[in-house]
Amino acid sequence: MLSKQVTKIVQNLEKKKFREKYNLFKIEGEKLVGELLHSPLKIHSLIAFPSWLEQNKKALSNVNIIEADEREMHGISNFQSLPEVIALAEIPVHIYRKEEVLDSLSLVLNGIQDPGNLGTILRVADWFGIGNIFCDADCAGVYNPKCVQASMGAIFRVKTFYTDLSVLLSELKQEGLPVFGTFLDGKNIYTTALSTRGLIVMGNEG
């Protein structure tokens, strides 16, 4: 049974201040939760229908499990079609390693305020094998539920950092790391041979 306290916590995770307070974020749906179970992230709890728990019980050792019915799931889900499972995971602490950034391709995001767009960018970055993503304070939160959903699991694999981009770019340019900009009339990234190291800078939507 889903308690009122847990229901309130899950509902509050829509807001950044509560995600920071509890150090948790929400993952909805069978596919994303399936990816979460195979990721290194620490799962705080799983809220699910009994049928889903029975089908997946072999993968659920050492996980705090809460059974829920349809009425209870309606109260905590953003989906129009109810998911069978919702997970709460701890927000990971990513360690910045300069030597790793200097030897790879990273993404720098300025003012990406729409969480859905940010999640899509994370997904594309993951597809290209980009592992480090730097955001400024004007970007949406990467653990916003809309961003998590749009990332389609990339959020479990890429490392994200919020930082002063001018300081970061200055420091890494001094180390000789090339910087690439994105433009509407530029070359198609899908048909362009990318460097194996450097910073790709993307600006805001507007």
Task: Locate each region found by the language model.
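Boundary-proximal intrinsically disordered activation/regulatory segments immediately upstream
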Residues: 1-54, 139-140
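Generic beta-sheet signal
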Residues: 49, 68-69, 88, 136, ...
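Active-site regions of enzymes building and remodeling cell-envelope glycoconjugates
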Residues: 59-69, 104, 193-199
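Glycine/small-residue-rich loop that forms an oxyanion/phosphate-binding "nest" at active or ligand-binding sites
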Residues: 63-90
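Short, hinge-like loop/turn segments at secondary-structure boundaries
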Residues: 85, 150-154, 197-200
